[in-house]
Each structure stands twice: as C-alpha cells, then as structure tokens.
Regions:
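Mixed-charge (acidic/basic) macromolecular-recognition segments
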Residues: 55-170, 206
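Short, flexible beta-strand-to-coil junctions
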Residues: 32-37, 71-73, 198
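Short, surface-exposed beta-strand/loop "edge" segments at domain boundaries and coil↔beta transitions
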Residues: 36-41, 76-78, 202-205
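Non-Sec secretion/translocation targeting segments of pathogen effectors
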Residues: 173, 211-220
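Short, hydrophobic/π-rich interface segment
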Residues: 2-10, 154-184
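Conserved aromatic
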Residues: 44-48, 142, 171
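N-terminal ordered "arm"
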Residues: 1-63
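Long, highly charged low-complexity segments enriched in Glu/Asp and Lys/Arg with interspersed Ser/Thr
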Residues: 179-212
Length: 220
C-alpha cells in the first residue's frame, strides 16, 4: 500500500493473493513468475520452501505451469546465461541450487576455480555443477597458466622442496617437467587457467561409476 502525499488515495498493491515486487534484500537474479492473471516475484537464491509457497499462491504445482522471466542483478553474463539455460532445460529449483553453489564458491574466493573446473569437466547441468563445487578441493587450479611451460613453472613455484637458481633457470626444461606430471593425472588448459585432477577420476566425482555399476548389476 502506497501513500504519496496528503489528500491522495491509498493504492493497494496487494491483491490478497500475490505479493507485489519488492526488492528488500540483495539477490543475484530476480525472477518473475506468471500464471494466467497472477504474478509472483522471487529473489534468487532463496529457500526451496519460498519457491513452493510462490507456486501455491499462483495456483501452480510446478514451475512448468508458469512463464518465467529472469533479470540479472549481481551475476556476470556467463553465470546468468547458465542460469537461464538451466531454468529452461531443467527447472527453477535446479537453477536456484546452482546459484547457492556459486555463492559458496564466491564466499571461499573460488569462483574462478569453479568456472575452470566446469570447463575442465565440460559439464553444465545443475547436478554436475553442484557435485563439482562440492568436490572442488580435489582439483588443483593454476590461475593464468595456459601452456606447459607456464604449468611447469607454477608446479615448481608451489613446491617448497624445489628451487631453481635464476642463473640456470633458462636451461631448465619446464615443459618436460609439466608433461611428466600430466602423465600421472588428468589435465586441461582452460580459458582462465589450468586444472589438474589427481587420485580420482571425473566419473568418480560425478558419481557416474556408481551409475554404471548399478546398470551392470541391473542387467545381470
């Protein structure tokens, strides 16, 4: 309800069914849900229960029954496009869960690493992104490293047991050293750095090995 000045009439913005738009807190993405003549607004990421309540006020049982319009508030273009794709191909719940993973990564100063790990895995569905964020400590990330020589230098710099005197540095074979490490793990040069995965396979992290075993057992 708004009151502009003395003598003006009250304007009732609440129709007793759906709350009006009111951005009372920070959000990453603003979502407008419509069904027939009713409209609800969500400020993502939010609690799953908040989405369910909004759907109930719309008279909908799931997000497929609504038209959804997203507006970027505090995400970069890359993540906004991903959230749009996930909302379209999966649902709003999945997109909301991915935004929670993004918030966790950003809080831990690991958003660049998460983006590189997603590039490494080449998986962009919500379940994969969430599993990759949950297991981000299993990956090694070298920011702004794009080739074998740079990787070799970065690997040596991070190891306190290694030291190369600047007088002989130009003679050290950094590429060959990087190759020896890459032979023992999975490695990919990504758009914003290099990612290494050691000790586990990507399939294990994504839970695909368990799925394969279940399918094999089911076929016996």
């Amino acid at each position: 309800m708004l009151f502009e000045h003395e003598g003006a009439k009250f304007i009732n913005e609440y129709d007793r069914h759906n709350f009006p738009e009111y951005l009372y807190d920070q959000c990453r993405i603003f979502a407008e849900l419509k069904k027939e003549d009713r409209t609800e607004y969500l400020y993502l990421p939010t609690h799953e229960l908040t989405i369910k309540k909004a759907l109930k006020r719309l008279g909908a049982t799931n997000t497929d029954e609504c038209s959804i319009k997203l507006e970027d508030k505090e995400t970069d273009n890359l993540w906004f496009e991903r959230i749009q794709d996930i909302t379209a191909t999966e649902n709003l719940y999945a997109a909301n869960n991915v935004l929670r993973a993004v918030e966790r990564a950003e809080k831990n100063n690991e958003l660049d690493k998460l983006e590189a790990v997603i590039d490494f895995a080449d998986r962009y569905d919500s379940a994969s992104i969430i599993k990759l964020e949950d297991n981000i400590d299993n990956f090694r990330y070298f920011d702004n490293v794009y080739d074998k020589e740079g990787l070799g230098r970065a690997l040596i710099d991070e190891n306190d047991d290694y030291y190369i005197d600047e007088d002989i540095e130009e003679f050290f074979m950094f590429e060959q050293y990087a190759e020896s490490v890459m032979d023992e793990c999975d490695c990919k040069f990504c758009d914003n750095g290099t990612v290494l995965l050691e000790g586990l396979t990507l399939a294990e992290i994504l839970g695909e090995d368990n799925q394969s075993e279940e399918m094999t057992m089911g076929g016996m």
